[in-house]
C-alpha cells in the first residue's frame, strides 16, 4: 500500500493528513479474490445440483458438512426406530423435490452419539434444517411430506 503524508493546507494547523492511495496492483488482487469467490460459488451450486441421494453423516463429518452447504436438512434416526423407517422415503423424496436447492443428510444417533448429545437430540426421528451452518428450524416425530416442504420453503432464498 502506498501512503502519502501531506501538510494540511489551512494556516496555523500543525497536523498532517494521511492519504491512502489504492494502486492498480491492489485493485487487481482484490478483483482476483472476488472472482475466485464467485467461481467457487458457481462450482458449489453445480455440485449441489448433482447430489441425488442423502449424505450419510457421522460425528467426524457433521459440522464440516452443515457448514459446506447453504441449506441442509438432517435426519437424526436409528435403525430400530419404526417411525424413522417410515419417514425415510419421505425425507429421501424431499431431497429429490428440492434438488439443487437443498441437501439431505442422515445421522444414525446410535453410531454417532457425540453430535446427538451436543444437539440435545432426545427423540427420534428429529429433522433439523441448517442454513449456512446454523439450525433454523426443526421437527420432532413423524410428519407429512407437506409439513417438511413448508419448513424448507420458509428458508429457501
What are these regions (language model features)?
Residues 1-73, 79, 90-97, 101, ...:
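Proteins that catalyze or organize thiol-disulfide redox chemistry
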Residues 73-74, 104, 127:
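Hydrophobic beta-strand anchors of alpha/beta hydrolase catalytic cores
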Residues 81-84:
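Hydrophobic heptad-repeat coiled-coil signature
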Residues 109:
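Hydrophobic anchor residue in the Rossmann-like NAD(P) cofactor-binding loop of oxidoreductases
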Residues 119-130:
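Structural micro-motif
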Amino acid at each position: 500500500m502506498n501512503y502519502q503524508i501531506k501538510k494540511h493546507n489551512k494556516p496555523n494547523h500543525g497536523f498532517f493528513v494521511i492519504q491512502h492511495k489504492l494502486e492498480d496492483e491492489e485493485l487487481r488482487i482484490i478483483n482476483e479474490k472476488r472472482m475466485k469467490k464467485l467461481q467457487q460459488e458457481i462450482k458449489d451450486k453445480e455440485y449441489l445440483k448433482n447430489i441425488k441421494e442423502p449424505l450419510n453423516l457421522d460425528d467426524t463429518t457433521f459440522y464440516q458438512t452443515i457448514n459446506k452447504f447453504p441449506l441442509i436438512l438432517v435426519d437424526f434416526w436409528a435403525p430400530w426406530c419404526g417411525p424413522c423407517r417410515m419417514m425415510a422415503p419421505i425425507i429421501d423424496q424431499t431431497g429429490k423435490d428440492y434438488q439443487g436447492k437443498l441437501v439431505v443428510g442422515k445421522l444414525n444417533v446410535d453410531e454417532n452419539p457425540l453430535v446427538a448429545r451436543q444437539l440435545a437430540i432426545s427423540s427420534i426421528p428429529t429433522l433439523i434444517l441448517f442454513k449456512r451452518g446454523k439450525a433454523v428450524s426443526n421437527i420432532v416425530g413423524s410428519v407429512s411430506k407437506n409439513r417438511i416442504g413448508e419448513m424448507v420453503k420458509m428458508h429457501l432464498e
